[in-house]
Amino acid sequence: EYGFTAYILGQDQEEAHKHISLFEQHLNALKHQLPQAQYYAYLSSVYTYKLGLDKKHLMKYASGIFDNIKRAMELDDEDPLVLSMQGNVEFYSPFGSKKKALEYYLKADSIYHQMPNTAELWNVRAVQMTIVQCLAKMNRAEDAKQQCMQFLEEEPDCVIFQNLLSELTNPSNN
């Protein structure tokens, strides 16, 4: 639900509202089964999605985002999911830092690569995608291309990386 909710948020606000509520219900039901750091990281994303639908409550939702990701990092700052969520907060926050975001994403990717059986985890590809996007936003297009090609070596059929590489190679076609 985490990834789909982010996707639907930009497509259909009414449907997104339903998915945010469902995501929050499921997250609360799993509170004691998930590692606590991951629970708080996901809870931070719930507030992010709510903010995406309702900017009038910026302070309330921003507080929920920052308080929960801070709690997650205090609990486990070596969990790659938590690191990637902290990276997202840095990347997307108006006062965030792309440089810090990149550091969190790279650390998460490094940890994922040390773990067994992560090749099929979509979170790994999501982190790698955001590394490329972050480098591009930092005006480091050549680094972004190199990183994208490296990720394509790991996952040659990954359409996301093929598309990103095409965008980076042919920016005038976008």
Segments predicted by a language model, with ranges:
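Amphipathic alpha-helical repeat scaffolds of TPR domains
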Residues: 1-10, 33-53, 78-94, 122-133
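Short coil/turn connectors between adjacent alpha-helices in alpha-solenoid helical repeat scaffolds
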Residues: 6-18, 48-62, 92-102, 137-142
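Flexible helix-coil transition and linker loops at the boundaries of alpha-helical arrays
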Residues: 25-40, 70-78, 109-124
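Alpha-helical membrane segments in multi-pass integral membrane proteins
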Residues: 98-108, 125-130
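Terminal, low-structured helical/coil segments at or just beyond the last alpha-helical repeat
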Residues: 118-174
